[in-house]
Amino acid sequence: MAAHLLLSGHHVTVYNRTPAKAQAFLAEYGDTGRVQTATTPRQAAEGAEVVFSCVGNDHDLAQVILGDEGALNGMDPHTILVDHTTASAQIARELFEHCIKAGVDFIDAPVSGGQGGAQNGLLTVMCGGETQAFEKIRPLAMAFSRACTLMGESGAGQLTKMVNQICIAGLVQGLGEGIAFGMKAGLDMNLVLDVISKGAAQSWQMENRGKTMVADQFDFGFAVDWMRKDLNIVLQEAQKNGARLPVTALVDQFYADVQQMGGRRWDTSSLIKRLT
């Protein structure tokens, strides 16, 4: 995502909690003359018009934004903070309030599309916040996305991402069961996928994960650990708003089984490992 911003002509300052990753980015793109590294989030944010963040969870997010050396302490008034972390709606709203007090705009903007989407500039960005700030950052976000949409007020981006993860959980489990059934039935599952992907069963998961599931390949993509983190956020939010998510809760436990099998870093499509 940072590379797409840089290659679109913007000046970029990068910070990573693993310094070697920031240095590797500098080594790869330093010859553009528009990139530098920072040693703290605060330093990275100093003088920036827009600050983008993307970390692991609520705790990490609070640390890099609100800590003594956090980004917010380095941001000038009228700067816009855009957070791409998949986090809770609660922390999105809390950050919005902190930013308002500091004279800074905040957009919660989780993404969908995985590593491939980020690398190819084809992410989907779902945003929550105020319209004026969103309109300013949308052209920047389009450098690494194919869609960037304002879903509502602060927190709406995170709530939309939760809907996304609920749908993925059910789709991947259904796809895994279908493939496992077909294999037990002695069908050529690659041929089956070619056929049914042209009908009503077609999905992104089928197109991009079906054949790797057949081939028992899972050493890529979106890790099971991260999916469980996301589903935990979903299930906690469902307890607050009264939504009933029986299938999502069940699939979350199936992912726990995959973790016990040693699949913490396997792609989410590894749900099929429980069935074969």
What does each model-identified segment do?
Residues 41-105:
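Rossmann-fold NAD(P) dinucleotide-binding segment
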Residues 30-36, 102-104, 146, 243:
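A short helix-to-beta-strand connector/capping loop
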Residues 1-5, 95, 140, 181:
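Hydrophobic residues within alpha-helices
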Residues 1-53, 78, 84-85, 115:
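NAD(P)+-binding Rossmann beta1-loop-alpha1 motif at the extreme N-terminus of oxidoreductases
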Residues 121-128, 149, 153-185, 196-208, ...:
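Active-site-proximal catalytic alpha-helix in oxidoreductases
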Residues 10-11, 104, 187:
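Short phosphate-binding/catalytic loops that engage adenosine nucleotides
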Residues 55, 86-166:
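Rossmann-fold dinucleotide-binding core
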